[in-house]
Amino acid sequence: MRKSKIAITLGLVVGIVLSAFAFLFGYTRYLLSLPTYDTEGTIPIETNLEQLPDVEPEMKEGMKIPVYNNPQIHNILLIGSDRRDDKSYGRSDSMILLSINEKTDKFHLTSFQRTIWVSIPKDTDPRYQRYWSPNNALNAAHTWGGPRLLLKTIQRNFRLDVQHYVKVDFKNFVKVIDRVGGVEIELTEAEASHLRGQGHQVTAGKQLLKGDACLAYSRIRRIDSDWKRMGRQRTVIEALIKKMRSMSPLSLPRVLEDIMRNLETNLTPGQLQSYIFNVLKYRKYEIDQMFVPIEQHKARTKTKSGHEVYKINWVKNIEAIRAFIEQ
């Protein structure tokens, strides 16, 4: 009789465990069905760059550096697009390289200033071929050829082998922030005043901002600079990560669904699944950040058309990025 009870108990435990695994497997498959997948394939390493025409001397020096790849560091370009219609790629207002360092248990966030003067491959969408020029601001690459051309441009100029991207439209990001109940942002008086002018009831200091207020906050530029705007966009991302870390694991599924539903990526479902399974581990990772170009190795200038751009010391910036993501 005793053996029979033990067998029944073990059977129940095994049944519960198997049911849990079946649920998790099914739920993960559901999550993986939500994003929009780009299946164009890998991006080859460019060669013979010394033969490129119209490359400025400072750029050529940077291009002599071999493309960097470290198997212990997973690089994913996070693209925040401010798309005004469904047919265009939109402007890549936010370009942040997420480097997951499995050796040091850290997330490194490298924000690229969108008006860095770069060399752009002639691999545009046919619709925008007439707008292409060999040198332009970094975010022009996304406008002319979407995420793939942006990845190629980053490889060529920053000497980084970044094969993967995750893209979200800022307007859709509002839903995710609302799902977590808003995020806490510390506002300056100037920022608060600007947001009040757009109808948001906020004051200076720490504020709990809902999605639409976060979107307005991340777009602020007129009160200071595009550089500060980059910082605000990253502040929102960090605040969201912090909020998700503090949430109960039982609350995360709905948030993950909203995030996945609003993603476009060239990661495969299998690769995404691997990152999802590591969510609990990643919650313990430290986060650090840097801006590119670095302050002492950039120069603000204007193009012939009057647009303000940054020309940079490529060798110094490339070295700084590598040192940062290896920490």
Give names to the regions the model predicted.
Residues 2-327:
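Non-catalytic, solvent-exposed segments at the cell envelope interface
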